[in-house]
Amino acid sequence: LYMYLKKKGYNDNELRETGLFTYDEKRGVTDKFWNRVMFPIMDANNRVIAFGGRVMGDAKPKYLNSPETKVFDKSRNLYGLNVARSSRKDYFLICEGYMDVISLHQAGFNNAVAALGTAFTQRHATLIKRYVKEVVLTFDSDEAGIKAALRAIPYLRDAGLAIKVLNMKPYKDPDEFIKALGREAYEERIKNATNFFI
């Protein structure tokens, strides 16, 4: 990618600002997302503003996002918002990751969004409030997912959003659930999601 962009006339300073490369004295310039499946991160107006990458294999970190730039602020964007904002649903499904959003969109739940590899923030809740009045939390069913949901709830409540929590068990996440049981079963879980009051 680096050589391609250099041939297209971009200089090193311009390329450094993209966040697509790493620079060090020992190895020189390397592609930051080498050997990763790439997820374009788009703003609410369908403009690509960053990338996420999932490693193939066991290397760490498993997921890697573009660094924050003038156009990309993780706390001001949600993965999938460009699709969800046009949904006919009056609520958003909030999940943890790219694959969950993609799986839900493919199953017809185009109202799914996720925070971008960061903890859910008040800014995320305020952004969601622009589009809907209710959310259904579909975070992972493991301990980390439960803790993440409990941290998100006060922000959502403070933004004035109605909150429901979807029981994912015995599955770990929406992607796994839909692959195992399908769209109709997930729709039923949404209907039976628990209202959350604090």
Task: Outline where the language-model segments fall.
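Phosphate/diphosphate-binding loops
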Residues: 143-157, 163
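Alpha-helical interaction elements
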Residues: 99, 109, 158-160, 166-168
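Short gly/pro/ser/thr-enriched loop/turn and capping motifs at secondary-structure boundaries
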Residues: 119-121, 144-146, 171-173
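Phosphate-handling DNA/RNA-contact segment within nucleic-acid enzymes
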Residues: 2-131, 135, 148-149
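Short, hinge-like loop/turn segments at secondary-structure boundaries
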Residues: 131-132, 153-155, 180-187
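Flexible glycine/proline-rich, aromatic-decorated loop/lid segments
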Residues: 125-128, 154-156, 195
